[in-house]
From Swiss-Prot:
Substrate binds at R102, D139. It is found in: Cytoplasm. One of its GO terms (biological process) is lysine biosynthetic process. It comes from Coxiella burnetii (strain RSA 493 / Nine Mile phase I). Belongs to the transferase hexapeptide repeat family. Homotrimer. GO terms for cellular component: cytoplasm. Its EC number is 2.3.1.117. Keywords: Acyltransferase, Amino-acid biosynthesis, Cytoplasm, Diaminopimelate biosynthesis, Lysine biosynthesis, Repeat, Transferase. This is 2,3,4,5-tetrahydropyridine-2,6-dicarboxylate N-succinyltransferase. The lineage of its organism: Bacteria, Pseudomonadati, Pseudomonadota, Gammaproteobacteria, Legionellales. Pathway: Amino-acid biosynthesis; L-lysine biosynthesis via DAP pathway; LL-2,6-diaminopimelate from (S)-tetrahydrodipicolinate (succinylase route): step 1/3. It is an enzyme of class 2 (transferase). It catalyses: (S)-2,3,4,5-tetrahydrodipicolinate + succinyl-CoA + H2O = (S)-2-succinylamino-6-oxoheptanedioate + CoA.
Length: 271
């Protein structure tokens, strides 16, 4: 994989020197090999190592090069046609899902996204570079953006949106760690991280500029929901006191044992 990384990095530095029609064969093959590695889960856009998430920038480069070098093509979906550069993940009988993966009709998964065993997709959208780990449910009309990393046993409720982050290359993707619940119509975007075991209420919107207020510590932070947080939508007064600003409010923090005994609705009501 080291050779592949070197080819992709060099190609990205010289990307203005070739087009769809003139891309060298060696680069074309390296791009497709990288997309295939992302597609089957052997490579991830981001990985957690020694407790820290690290981004594989070169894998992002490969996706951007894929967009640049692939021609527009017509894709036959049986009942309609699509016109795009990137094919769907399951295009024929030879590209079967892994064991236990369920893809309900009208769910869309692009090539280069990975679905681990025992994931369930209701009619939803999974973009290129995304990684969805085992036991996760992506509910109806939920979206998982490019390069987003979704952990094990996560529930993305109806209409929830997990934002994609392709550029800048060094930026972390949006990350939802294991055992999280993301409420209906909530949006987690711009590389925000929701740590393990957190519960996000319905209609919570969190980007990098959204204040995250911890009711217990009275601290305001940005870009990260700590492990075990129970989060609801709220607001904080402005510095001049003339208006309120939307905020995400951490009303409490719970451990796995508490979550197993108490329903999600009870946790949120107690806030």
């Amino acid at each position: 994989m080291t050779d592949l990384k070197t080819i992709i990095e060099e190609a990205y530095q010289n990307k203005d020197n070739f087009t769809t029609d003139t891309v060298p064969k060696k680069i074309h093959q390296a791009i497709h090999q990288t997309i295939e590695l992302l597609d089957n889960g052997e490579l991830r856009i981001a990985e957690k190592q020694n407790g820290q998430w690290n981004t594989n920038e070169w894998a992002k480069m490969a996706i951007l090069l894929y967009f640049k070098t692939e021609p527009l093509k017509t894709f036959d979906a049986g009942y309609t046609f699509f016109y795009d550069k990137i094919p769907l993940k399951y295009t024929n009988n030879t590209s079967q899902p892994q064991s236990g993966v369920r893809v309900v009709p009208h769910a869309i998964v692009r090539k280069g996204a990975y679905l681990a065993p025992n994931t369930v997709l209701m009619p939803s959208y999974i973009n290129i570079g995304a990684y969805v780990d085992s036991g996760t449910l992506i509910d109806t009309w939920a979206t998982v953006g490019s390069c987003a990393q979704i952990g094990k046993n996560v529930h993305l409720s109806g209409g929830a949106g997990i934002g994609g982050v392709l550029e800048p290359l060094q930026a972390h993707p949006t990350i939802i760690e294991d055992d999280c619940f993301i409420g209906a119509r909530s949006e987690i975007v711009e590389g925000v991280m929701v740590e393990k075991g957190s519960v996000i209420s319905m209609g919570v919107f969190v980007g990098q500029s959204t204040p995250i207020y911890n009711r217990q510590t009275q601290e305001i932070t940005y870009g990260r929901i700590p492990a075990g947080s129970v989060v609801i939508p709220g607001s904080l007064p402005s510095k001049d006191g003339h208006y309120n600003r939307y905020s995400a409010i951490i009303v409490k923090q719970v451990d796995k044992k508490t979550r197993s005994k108490v329903s999600l609705n009870e946790l949120l009501r107690e806030g």
